[in-house]
Amino acid sequence: MKALAKLKAEEGIWMTNVPQPELGHNDIMIKIRKTAICGTDVHIYNWDEWSQKTIPVPMVVGHEYVGEVVAIGQEVKGFNIGDRVSGEGHITCGHCRNCRGGRTHLCRNTVGVGVNRPGSFAEYLVIPAFNAFKIPDNISDELAAIFDPFGNAVHTALSFDLVGEDVLVSGAGPIGIMAAAVCKHVGARHVVITDVNEYRLDLARKMGVTRAVNVNKENLNDVMAELGMTEGFDVGLEMSGAPPAFRALLNSMNHGGRIAMLGIPPSDMSIDWNQVIFKGLFIKGIYGREMFETWYKMAALIQSGLDLTPIITHRFSIDEFQQGFDAMRSGKSGKVILNWD
């Protein structure tokens, strides 16, 4: 079958032919319709330090997708041929303390689709049926294809009560923008997002944020004053991994504020711990999506009127995959869809 794979330990990704995956007793086989390019896929393309330590070569990559069930393992219940599905990209063990305790997203033995095992940039994907999620009929293929990153956004945004709260999102990548849209949709008062990329900030404005702030051109304190905020932000969502952005977020938080961190900062990042301690801030790390509460919330948010369509900015056939990766690497894109049909 046709697949996109990391074939060489160098920059790039290549179209190739690989054997169709084998179906296990507890698996389903999915014929891929659409995939989306993740920031992780760009890291793998760039062959950065993380990729060199993590990705075995060769490896079929990709983990954002939607498709149709075409084969079912003999032990599988609850799925039928023809079901439209996406799926959780973290394959968990089922027997560690967190899995058995209902905290499956924190499984210490997690294996990543398209990272540690063959991924979705292929004509067919096999995953455990446990990981598959049926897509409701009133959700489009394109939106279903970005459920994985949308889930990161939902998990981060819904970490804390948002109704009537003021929220600061640092980092206007696609996940940060979707998180900001979720906050606004569920009842936050002011949702402010910061970045230095004007293309992405314009995209955030289209998604309905209160203010999209280029911190190279505007002072965040001035924006807060303009909005009538006198005590700081109640909730902070750190999506950038950039130390200056996190420091600015800490400085802008209200006393007793709550922070969810999805962005991965450098290991040697320094911050003013007085901001954390004397403000009594609560900081929560975010990994993946809660299985599967986040997935049900995703579907419900879209069905209740949350419009994510502006975040999808580019569409290519799979044979034009290089243009898709070029768009992602340019910084002037939202989500990029690759069509396999």
Curated annotation (Swiss-Prot):
Catalytic activity: L-threonine + NAD(+) = (2S)-2-amino-3-oxobutanoate + NADH + H(+)
Entry keywords, A to Z: Cytoplasm, Metal-binding, NAD, Oxidoreductase, Zinc
Site feature location: Important for catalytic activity for the proton relay mechanism but does not participate directly in the coordination of zinc atom: 148
Pathway: Amino-acid degradation; L-threonine degradation via oxydo-reductase pathway; glycine from L-threonine: step 1/2
Cofactor: Zn(2+)
Protein family (similarity comment): Belongs to the zinc-containing alcohol dehydrogenase family.
Quaternary assembly: Homotetramer.
Annotated function: Catalyzes the NAD(+)-dependent oxidation of L-threonine to 2-amino-3-ketobutyrate.
The protein, known as: L-threonine 3-dehydrogenase
Origin organism lineage: Bacteria, Pseudomonadati, Pseudomonadota, Gammaproteobacteria, Enterobacterales
Gene name for this UniProt entry: tdh
